[in-house]
Amino acid sequence: MSHTIPSASVLPAVARRGFFTAAAAAVAAAKVVAAEDEYGPHAGPVRYPDYRLVELDKRFGKLKLGNTPIQRLYHSPNMLWAEGPAWNGSGRYLVWSDIPNNIQHRWLEEDGHVSVIRNPANNSNGNTFDTHGRQISFEHLTRSVARYEHDGTRTVLADKFNGKSLNAPNDGVVHPVTGDIWFSDPGYGALMDYEGTLADTGSVQPFQKEALYRWEASTGKLFQVADDINKPNGVCFSPDYKKLYAADTGASHYPDAPEEHPRLGHR
């Protein structure tokens, strides 16, 4: 949805004064926000509670600590697109992808050191860890779900469904009991060369209809869970692991969605 804002020249005198007053206030507020968003040795003091921590559902209020700030762990002008952060609780480190640069980084909790752990990284997007501590990456370039063993070797878990290539796996989670991997395949990484390789099919659905999948750990088989979501992107489990939530980043609307949240519905 877009809105056209009239220029000040076509507003009545009173409205123009209000327009410029509001604009000046917005600029001043933006400067305050920008100042508070600064990091590094010249940044101002942190204010509590951190205004950037916002709960859209009041039930999350009891989980928010008022004196907890957002901290920047790493910044580099060479990093183009940080995606797919995954925390390894045993190793106490964080990994993430820089999709266009085709690399993966690792941040160590012990000393804050950041290094490149995988180059190239097959334009990986999401990452997670299985119940054995092995890294799972969802790769655009190879259109596959890959597992990195403890010795560093790469094992392809899934790259086809019904004999056709996957589009470009995006994000996924591992069920802690079954070890199954649930992941999304919206196809973004096959629509351009910037974050993968452009598919030669000439379709916005490069090889498959956009879908959610489940890779079964006990058999190695791949099952399609749902294909009625426009662009399934980020996924996560409910706290009891009985529900899977998927973010739809496509321009879609559901007729059965509740009125207060028109973009949401029971899936």
Language-model region placement:
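Beta-rich, blade/repeat-based domains predominating
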Residues: S76-R92, P120-E139, S144, N162-I181, ...
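N-terminal secretory signal peptides
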Residues: M1-V14, A22-A25
